[in-house]
Swiss-Prot record:
Binds 1 pyruvoyl group covalently per subunit. The record marks E62, S63 as: Cleavage (non-hydrolytic). This is S-adenosylmethionine decarboxylase proenzyme. Heterotetramer of two alpha and two beta chains arranged as a dimer of alpha/beta heterodimers. SUPFAM superfamilies: S-adenosylmethionine decarboxylase. Gene3D superfamilies: 3.30.160.750, S-adenosylmethionine decarboxylase domain (3.30.360.110). Its cofactor is pyruvate. Is synthesized initially as an inactive proenzyme. Formation of the active enzyme involves a self-maturation process in which the active site pyruvoyl group is generated from an internal serine residue via an autocatalytic post-translational modification. Two non-identical subunits are generated from the proenzyme in this reaction, and the pyruvate is formed at the N-terminus of the alpha chain, which is derived from the carboxyl end of the proenzyme. Its EC number is 4.1.1.50. It comes from Thermosipho africanus (strain TCF52B). InterPro entries: AdoMetDC_C, AdoMetDC_fam_prok, AdoMetDC_N, S-AdoMet_deCO2ase_core, S-AdoMet_deCOase_pro-enz.
Length: 130
């Protein structure tokens, strides 16, 4: 089934707690994850909370990647939303699982903007002229 985008919602458990609390490492890892998908990086914003935790977003031309970490629990919540046929959010998922040293994951994928539900013909390109 064709869709405008793919949205991976991932729960990373039993991660490296030091990595989860390192805002520079998390930001660089999220940018690298965007590059792994084949996406075009637009901007990013990350914040380290006190006493611990990091939240951040990487905006890509094809949508966004976000992360929220709870180092005290070894846990990270990650959204990987990409649009178009040229990017693969699963590459970002695989990369982040390795970088965060996650021992256990729960992940689901949602198709966003399903062609048949919007009324777009199945053979239509993603980018139509307006």
């Amino acid at each position: 089934m064709k869709s405008l985008g793919r949205h991976i919602i991932a729960e990373f458990y039993d991660c490296d707690k030091e990595i989860l609390d390192n805002v520079e490492k998390i930001e660089q890892s999220m940018k690298n994850a965007a590059y792994e998908t084949g996406a075009t990086l637009v901007n990013s914003s990350f914040h380290r909370f006190l006493p611990y935790g990091v939240s951040g977003v990487v905006v890509i031309s094809e949508s966004h990647l976000t992360i929220h970490t709870w180092p005290e629990y070894g846990y990270a919540a990650v959204d990987l939303f990409t649009c178009g046929d040229d990017v693969d959010p699963w590459k970002a998922f695989t990369y982040l699982k390795e970088v965060l040293k996650s021992q256990r994951v729960h992940v689901v994928e949602h198709l966003r903007g399903k062609y048949d539900e919007i009324g777009i013909p199945e053979n239509s390109p993603h980018k139509m002229e307006v």
